[in-house]
Amino acid sequence: MSVQVVSAAAAAKVPEVELKDLSPSEAEPQLGLSTAAVSAMAPPAGGGDPEAPAPAAERPPAPGPGSGPAAALSPAAGKVPQASAMKRSDPHHQHQRHRDGGEALVSPDGTVTEAPRTVKKQIQFADQKQEFNKRPTKIGRRSLSRSISQSSTDSYSSAASYTDSSDDETSPRDKQQKNSKGNSDFCVKNIKQAEFGRREIEIAEQEMPALMALRKRAQGEKPLAGAKIVGCTHITAQTAVLMETLGALGAQCRWAACNIYSTLNEVAAALAESGFPVFAWKGESEDDFWWCIDRCVNVEGWQPNMILDDGGDLTHWIYKKYPNMFKKIKGIVEESVTGVHRLYQLSKAGKLCVPAMNVNDSVTKQKFDNLYCCRESILDGLKRTTDMMFGGKQVVVCGYGEVGKGCCAALKAMGSIVYVTEIDPICALQACMDGFRLVKLNEVIRQVDIVITCTGNKNVVTREHLDRMKNSCIVCNMGHSNTEIDVASLRTPELTWERVRSQVDHVIWPDGKRIILLAEGRLLNLSCSTVPTFVLSITATTQALALIELYNAPEGRYKQDVYLLPKKMDEYVASLHLPTFDAHLTELTDEQAKYLGLNKNGPFKPNYYRY
């Protein structure tokens, strides 16, 4: 039997094939029909375009017997070898599938015709139509940024953590929320996220052994009984473990965030559900920031007697608005270099009226948090926000303190070409000995791909530097304050800001050049990523011991000045973390201790020792 196969548009182009006894899936590749030929066989969806007739040479014959779709494969078009091996399950028609999913009907006389085809329609869901065909009726700046790329930028990506409901766009200050106990003394984004936040806190507890050890100690004594601590720090799962530890030690706490972008909303909700007065949410405005601090301090029937600060904003606010509170405050514990600098300024001016503990310069903070935490989190923050590859990139790191050292080491290990700027000749020499080229920022600003500040200073990167940067240069800050980069100078009419991701802005110049600004110049790692919990355990334990020390110190031990944590306490913090590594300390013999002039139980180094 001879079978002739042809399409109306490409009859002469159809190659000869042999049809064997194969399954439809196996037979499809054997048909050898070109895409054009197959397309020509299929009638246009909806009957085709009546205003675009086929050329005369390709038009089908006039209607008549054997014409129409069934005639697209007529015996007169051409010949193919006899299909001797084809099996027929139907005595009248044999179905054979084409490549495009249509069917050919083989009649008893050998004519192959195209079967009527079912047009497949893709179901469009309502939300899909809105996303692609409509502009959302209500888009806030933050909701739009989340919808663009939530999973790669948010610190904890989860449907439980972020919602796109209209309620999410309502300011927490305008909401009336209560926890399960009916308490409303808090202000968070959404109290319903508490369960998710509680799971994050429980995970963090597994990596914070020292704080958990302090809680066990609290079962027998309450060293912070009667303490009323007002705190202003980053509100993360690690901070929550610290706050609950302080509560277990007997303290009452009220808390606000020290950074408008670093708060984990679900963690804040979990703390509020547990009864902690927390006033913080991710994405606060400047007005919200100070309002939250004021709500922690200005409370009827409650007055703080201890301050735990990170950056000095809480201390500054109390000095400015409620100076009389310092009559009952026993001390200040400050974590960051920015806040410590402000404390030393107050002390130098004779305005510091209570003792202050400088946690930032303690050994356990400097050598662990500032170095190891930043070494890991700088890469995490950059990767989540930009998806960049580090190998071969030219990076300038401004400042070679412990934070700068960690950033440089991480980037160098990933293959980046790293430059360093520094004002201190000792730190500068360290950078050179570590293999980094010491430069002035002006010397490399036109060529670098990334600029990272970690100095604790102001206007390290000026508008002049920003104007001279190359197109698509990434600019970010690893210091506490948002003053290191002169972001204010970029808010001018001639420059255009585009939010492309959460915490990622393109600042565009009139000539089309743009820079990529991360977290609006605020702390990159806690605004855009996460930090290693174990390292933060060391810092949080140091803060807790500093609070215990100042609160219980006899009158006269500490004057109105700034102090470092006693060396013995630094060593105690370190010892609490050693069991995690199954580490075993060597003990001095009596003879060795006498020879070194040390107590067998420490401290083992003098205060002037540089680790």
From Swiss-Prot:
NCBIfam families: ahcY, PRK05476.2-3. Substrate binds at T236, D310, E335, K365, D369. Belongs to the adenosylhomocysteinase family. The keyword NAD applies. Disulfide bonds: none annotated. Homotetramer. Forms heteromultimers with AHCYL1 (via the C-terminal region). Interacts with ITPR1; with lower affinity than AHCYL1 and maybe via ITPR1. Interacts with SLC4A4. Interacts with ZCCHC4. Pathway: Amino-acid biosynthesis; L-homocysteine biosynthesis; L-homocysteine from S-adenosyl-L-homocysteine: step 1/1. Residues 135-144 have a biased composition (Basic residues). It holds the Pfam family AdoHcyase. The gene is AHCYL2. It catalyses: S-adenosyl-L-homocysteine + H2O = L-homocysteine + adenosine. It comes from the Eukaryota. Expressed in parotid and acinar cells (at protein level). GO terms for molecular function: hydrolase activity. Residues 1-184 are annotated as: Disordered. Its EC number is 3.13.2.1. One of its GO terms (biological process) is one-carbon metabolic process. May regulate the electrogenic sodium/bicarbonate cotransporter SLC4A4 activity and Mg(2+)-sensitivity. On the contrary of its homolog AHCYL1, does not regulate ITPR1 sensitivity to inositol 1,4,5-trisphosphate. This is Adenosylhomocysteinase 3. Binds 1 NAD(+) per subunit. Keywords: Acetylation, Cytoplasm, Endoplasmic reticulum, Hydrolase, Microsome, NAD, One-carbon metabolism, Phosphoprotein. PROSITE patterns: ADOHCYASE_1 (PS00738), ADOHCYASE_2 (PS00739). InterPro entries: Adenosylhomocyst_ase-like_sf, Adenosylhomocysteinase-like, Ado_hCys_hydrolase_NAD-bd, NAD(P)-bd_dom_sf, S-Ado-L-homoCys_hydrolase_CS. Phosphorylated during neuronal differentiation at the LISN domain. Residues 2-109 are annotated as: LISN domain, inhibits interaction with ITPR1.
